């Protein structure tokens, strides 16, 4: 009964974090992230409820660079759309925090979560607070002279969310898996290493994807597999390792593509090895890996070819989390097998 409660709580928490990631991506893609120019963690739980309140919020927005340089023709109704998207994103963050924190306190003081098991939950809790600060730190970067958020802060904001999800999802499968795999006759060192490498590569790829979004790098070189006439554009070939390239949309798109090839090779190698083991659960994971990988790659290519349609781009981001989840599941089963 107690384990069932924790499983339900962790499942809901994981779903909420995924929703936060996807809605955060939509907020970025629609240019809604700078519509709320204040950070009010407690008092900002309600949207404007009258015409006058909307006028006040719109007037605040007009005082900042995004309106003056980009959206100077925006109407109040258009402002309401971007404001509500950002508001939903922030509200969902508050709800996610409550859904996580309140049961955590209850489970701990009731002794359902023991002292020996509390560490990952505390780390996730601390990261939730860091994430809230990082979100505002990111928004603040776009309220200065440049009407665009820092792509680096955006990437770290996303990665913190992914780490929180990783911790919670790992605890979820740890609570749900009562029976360990019996694979004593099989050498699992190689697939365990592949799993670790795959997780690392996907983290890097998610980080790069956030940089692409932050620099609008998906709106250039809308061709595949070449970037224009070359695999690597001549504009960056000569100074490929220059640190200034991290602010160059061409370079960022190029290494995000290269990262995609790396993900494909590592995940396919892992799936191939799992299929050779001939264990039904690991074989099932291998098929899930292949499906998630193909969905991730295909949505990425379509996103590029069609200049970042919001639905496809959001689906691409979602399948990055799905693919990561399957690999975490794989890593857990192999690591805990005997």
UniProtKB/Swiss-Prot annotation:
Protein family membership? Belongs to the COX15/CtaA family. Type 2 subfamily.
Q: What is its main location?
A: membrane
Q: Which organism is it from?
A: Rickettsia canadensis (strain McKiel)
Query: What is the protein named?
Result: Heme A synthase
The protein's required cofactors: heme b
Q: What does this protein do?
A: Catalyzes the conversion of heme O to heme A by two successive hydroxylations of the methyl group at C8. The first hydroxylation forms heme I, the second hydroxylation results in an unstable dihydroxymethyl group, which spontaneously dehydrates, resulting in the formyl group of heme A.
Chain positions recorded as heme binding sites: 256, 316
Any Pfam family hit: COX15-CtaA
The record, for InterPro entries, names:
COX15/CtaA_fam, HemeA_Synthase_type2
How the protein assembles, per its UniProt entry? Interacts with CtaB.
User: Which one GO biological process term can you cite for this protein?
Assistant: heme A biosynthetic process
Keyword Lyase in record: no
Can you say where in the cell this protein is located? Answer: Cell membrane
